[in-house]
Amino acid sequence: DKEQAAELTKYLESNAEGDNSTLHKVTIHSSFHQVTWADLEVEKVTEPVIDIKELEERTGSFQLEYMVSTRSGREKTYYHVREYYRIRYTPERMYLLDFDREMTQIFDENADVYANDKIMLGIVDKDVKMQESDGGNVFAFVSSNKLYSYNVADQKLARLFSFYGD
């Protein structure tokens, strides 16, 4: 709820350092719009797993990992989210010293992922690990820790490797 979240603006340091062009990487310098998931209506899928990175008398660093989803018609899209917070406590108030969120769409090879002769990976790091064959007919890429191969001539996508349970 953006109205409830408006209270958080006092903790943000929105400025030109924030990249407001993607939801993959959101920081303390991003706009309020980006920090509050822009126009995505996310639903929590899992409870956050909290990892205490540092804990001092007045400061602490924490990392949260969890899954969210969005819905488009009958299709659901899933995302892995990792958030990092560094906070300082004083008797008067708490200060957010740093915030970083990385959101990565879980690639679903069974969904409609083709558009304009491209494979749409969704919200991911712009530097996708990819390798092309010598003839250019086949290329392999990694998405969500899974290895895929795409045969351009046959227009076939195949998952080559993933860990058990993925």
Give the location of each predicted region.
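A short local loop/turn or secondary-structure capping micro-motif enriched for an aromatic residue
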Residues: T70-S72, T104-F107, S149, A158
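Short beta-strand edge/turn micro-motifs at domain boundaries
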Residues: E75-V128
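Surface-exposed, charged secondary-structure patches
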Residues: H29-E75
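Short, surface-exposed charged micro-motifs
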Residues: D51-I52, Y84-R86, V138
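Residues that act as N-cap/strand-start positions at coil-to-secondary-structure junctions
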Residues: K44-E47, V81, V124-K126, S133
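Non-catalytic accessory regions used for complex assembly or targeting
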Residues: T9, T59, P91-M94, G136
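Core segments of small alpha/beta cavity-forming domains
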Residues: D1-A38, A115-K156, S162-G165
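A mature extracytoplasmic/lumenal domain signature
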Residues: L64-V68, D100, S143-N145, D154
